[in-house]
């Protein structure tokens, strides 16, 4: 089910990111835009880095964040890479196929 939020361009779709707020017509979560902005990337630059988004969509995401900060912070925390994994090299171990 797609649920339109009170912000233009922002929707929730239970089939995309478990219903996390996203930009309508994309799979881009509001949190992705917010994380760039919190790193100091200005909105104009965000729309250049994410060229599939318009300035209106970027500002809609930031407006949604302004009204729902606790919710977006929760999504950011859920998707944070644990410090123990940051900078580590994950190694692929080849396994022979099991033949029955």
Regions found by a protein language model. Give the residues of each.
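Long, charge-rich, low-complexity alpha-helical segments
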Residues: 29-100
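N-terminal first-folded block
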Residues: 1-28
